[in-house]
């Protein structure tokens, strides 16, 4: 058996459809997009300024068009299909929404995915989806999201969905206990991705938070399935992140991650994740 740790190589800030093949060609097996809301309505895949150094911050697409395009790349038999493209993270920009809007936003994102990505359950895209929310107080987004799929008779699609509650970042990050509490309130057991990171222009810290999350993931009663780190553009940082034990690395340069995964000392311990790797299972070696 192959007992190397599977790694998700996440293309960062992929918001225009033209960028999707570029990142996949560079070796990404997953992408992250920023979903911007007008009120409770997910409207664009768009980040805006400021963003990572060396990147165009204002590339965008309409949310429904973006999802339909993702579907093409992840539906076997489609001319655009890429077998290695196995997961995407929706970085949901719900920071300015009130509680009522957060609940509505959960419904709207579920409806959008159901119609435009899963094709109402009729041979839709097969990739796994991680819904990433910026505030643990927004756990009700997850509840209403799940409710919509259940009511529509597509509860099975929740097998493909994971969740990340990573903030707020200001004034200080929530404790892992309060993060766990929020997941319980959301009714989420398993299917948990947690992220930690810095913009690529920030000085690399001591990774204390990252190490704490990884320790929690690997503990006896850990609630975290996978841990990913962002945004990593350097060979040295990639090696450090892998050494610490991450499952995913979000990067502006996916080929850097591929290069490191092929290096001596790394290729015998890590490999690029494939569709057969369950993103909701904690890796045990």
UniProtKB/Swiss-Prot annotation:
Q: What is its cofactor?
A: Mg(2+)
Q: Does the keyword Ligase apply?
A: no
Record InterPro entries: PLC-like_Pdiesterase_TIM-brl (IPR017946)
Q: Which UniProt keywords apply?
A: Cytolysis, Dermonecrotic toxin, Disulfide bond, Hemolysis, Lipid degradation, Lipid metabolism, Lyase, Magnesium, Metal-binding, Secreted, Toxin
Which cysteine-cysteine pairs are annotated as disulfide bonds in the entry? 51-57
Q: Which sites are catalytic?
A: 12, 47 (nucleophile)
By its UniProt entry, which SUPFAM superfamilies does this protein fall under?
PLC-like phosphodiesterases (SSF51695)
Q: Which GO terms describe its cellular component?
A: extracellular region
Q: Does the keyword Lipid metabolism apply?
A: yes
Q: How is the cofactor bound?
A: Binds 1 Mg(2+) ion per subunit.
Known EC number = 4.6.1.-
Q: Which reaction does it catalyse?
A: an N-(acyl)-sphingosylphosphocholine = an N-(acyl)-sphingosyl-1,3-cyclic phosphate + choline; an N-(acyl)-sphingosylphosphoethanolamine = an N-(acyl)-sphingosyl-1,3-cyclic phosphate + ethanolamine; a 1-acyl-sn-glycero-3-phosphocholine = a 1-acyl-sn-glycero-2,3-cyclic phosphate + choline; a 1-acyl-sn-glycero-3-phosphoethanolamine = a 1-acyl-sn-glycero-2,3-cyclic phosphate + ethanolamine
**Subcellular location per the Swiss-Prot or TrEMBL entry:** Secreted
Family label: Belongs to the arthropod phospholipase D family. Class I subfamily.
Protein name (record): Dermonecrotic toxin LlSicTox-alphaIII2
Organism taxonomic ancestry = Eukaryota, Metazoa, Ecdysozoa, Arthropoda, Chelicerata
């Amino acid at each position: 058996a192959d007992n190397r740790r599977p790694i998700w190589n996440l293309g960062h800030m992929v918001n225009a459809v033209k960028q999707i093949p570029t990142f996949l060609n560079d070796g990404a097996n997953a992408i992250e997009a920023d979903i911007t809301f007008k009120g409770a309505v997910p409207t664009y895949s768009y980040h805006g300024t400021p963003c990572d150094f060396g990147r165009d911050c204002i590339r965008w697409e309409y949310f429904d068009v973006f999802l339909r395009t993702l579907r093409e790349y992840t539906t076997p038999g489609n001319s655009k299909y890429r077998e290695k493209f196995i997961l995407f993270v929706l970085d949901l920009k719900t920071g300015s929404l009130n509680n009522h809007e957060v609940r509505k936003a959960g419904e709207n994102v579920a409806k959008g995915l159901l119609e435009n990505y899963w094709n109402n359950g009729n041979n839709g895209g097969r990739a796994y989806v991680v819904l990433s929310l910026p505030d643990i107080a927004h756990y009700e987004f997850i509840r209403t999201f799940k409710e919509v799929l259940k009511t529509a008779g597509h509860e099975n699609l929740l097998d493909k969905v994971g969740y990340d509650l990573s903030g707020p970042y200001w004034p200080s990050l929530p404790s892992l206990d309060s993060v766990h509490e929020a997941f319980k309130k959301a009714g989420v057991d398993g299917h948990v991705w947690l992220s930690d990171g810095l913009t690529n222009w920030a000085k690399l810290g001591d990774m204390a938070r990252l190490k704490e999350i990884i320790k929690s993931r690997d503990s006896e009663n850990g609630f975290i399935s996978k841990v990913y780190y962002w945004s990593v553009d350097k060979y040295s940082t990639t090696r450090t992140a892998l050494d610490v034990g991450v499952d995913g690395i979000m990067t502006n340069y996916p080929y850097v991650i591929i290069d490191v995964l092929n290096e001596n000392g790394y290729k015998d311990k890590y490999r690029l994740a494939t569709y057969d790797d369950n993103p909701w299972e904690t890796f045990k070696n």
